UniProtKB/Swiss-Prot annotation:
It comes from Francisella tularensis subsp. mediasiatica (strain FSC147). SMART domains: BATS (SM00876), Elp3 (SM00729). The gene is bioB. Keywords: 2Fe-2S, 4Fe-4S, Biotin biosynthesis, Iron, Iron-sulfur, Metal-binding, S-adenosyl-L-methionine, Transferase. This is Biotin synthase. Pfam families: BATS, Radical_SAM. Belongs to the radical SAM superfamily. Biotin synthase family. Binds 1 [4Fe-4S] cluster. The cluster is coordinated with 3 cysteines and an exchangeable S-adenosyl-L-methionine. The keyword Iron-sulfur applies. Its EC number is 2.8.1.6. GO terms for molecular function: 2 iron, 2 sulfur cluster binding; 4 iron, 4 sulfur cluster binding; biotin synthase activity; iron ion binding. [2Fe-2S] cluster binds at C90, C121, C181, R256. Homodimer. [4Fe-4S] cluster binds at C46, C50, C53.
Length: 313
């Protein structure tokens, strides 16, 4: 696949693009929606300078900071997520690298969440090959490490971590036989070509991502992008076309509509489902920002006749 071929797919008429994406989607997945829950297990004071992130220690934001939560409180959240219908429990920690003093505790938490009957996913920053192997042994199913944007636009967003470092972490994850969860953020001021190049980078990863989070910018006051923009710099039709293009390129990946969904109308979300989305974060909160409410999600899924994984088990 080349950049020009990706452009040609995206440039098709919207209805034609959605129809092809829907056919591919139904062939590989059918009518089910994967429900995942996300918990911030360590919040704030991150040494990275990601311009979109309220957890960066470089910016003055109003988030509540906390060190690594204790195991019991995390397990209680995981149990609640399972009872609410989530299939996967995702845990995020605002680190550049996981500290050695916290590694064993995180591994133990992964094991105990797995023992609850949930799939496990973590995002802990960069990890080396040995750490990836140990996380696999602990029972980790997925490791999330987003590329965020194209290689070309990346220096405009982050300067404290090189793009190639992200690729190396994904390589370590794949070599440990952990499923790769990797996507990006739209609406940060990037060009269309940057979005196409992000897709090309995802296609060229050391292992094909099994899960692709598609985020739209949530402008948070105090962050450089939050002070620059009042909303994500992408309209609904561009988002839907990007999702449909992603579905065509990644027929067997779960596409997750992630950050920014709470700002989308039910009609826009419906178009996203038609274009290939088959996974959402379920619960009223993401890491530090609000998510679409559970009541709203239940209403929309019922209205569309979509079934969650929990209902199909």
């Amino acid at each position: 696949m080349t950049l020009q071929q990706i452009k040609e797919i995206y440039s098709r008429p919207l209805t034609e693009l959605i129809l092809q994406a829907l056919e591919i989607h139904n062939k590989n997945f059918g009518n089910d929606i994967e429900l995942c829950s996300l918990k911030s297990i360590k919040t704030g004071t991150c040494p990275e300078d990601c311009k979109y992130c309220p957890q960066s220690g470089h910016y003055n934001t109003s988030i509540e900071k906390h060190k690594l939560l204790d195991k019991d409180s995390i397990l209680a959240e995981a149990k609640n997520a399972k009872d609410a219908g989530s299939k996967r429990f995702c845990m995020g920690a605002a680190w550049k690298h996981i500290p050695k003093k916290d590694f064993d505790q995180v591994a133990e938490i992964i094991t105990e969440v797995k023992n609850l009957g949930l799939e496990t996913c973590v995002t802990l920053g960069s990890i080396n090959a040995d750490e990836a192997t140990k996380l696999k042994q602990a029972g980790l199913d997925y490791y999330n490490h987003n590329l965020d944007t194209s290689r070309e636009f990346y220096p405009e967003i982050i300067t404290t971590r090189k793009f190639e470092e992200r690729i190396e972490t994904i390589r370590n994850v794949a070599n440990a036989d952990i499923n790769v969860c990797c996507g990006g953020i739209l609406g940060m001021g990037e060009s269309l070509d940057d979005r196409f190049n992000l897709l090309l980078e995802l296609l060229q990863l050391p292992a094909a991502p099994k899960s692709i989070p598609i985020n739209t910018l949530i402008p948070v006051k105090g962050t450089p992008l939050g002070d620059k923009y009042t909303n994500a710099q992408i309209d609904s039709f561009e988002l839907v076309k990007f999702i449909a293009t992603t579905r065509i390129l990644f027929p067997q990946a779960r596409l997750r509509l992630s950050a920014g969904r709470e700002n989308m109308s039910l009609e826009t979300q419906t178009l996203c489902f038609l274009a290939g989305i088959n996974s959402i974060f379920y619960g009223n909160k993401l890491l530090t920002e609000n998510n679409a409410t559970v009541n709203s999600d239940n209403f929309l899924l019922a209205k569309l006749g979509l079934k969650s994984n929990a209902e199909l088990c």
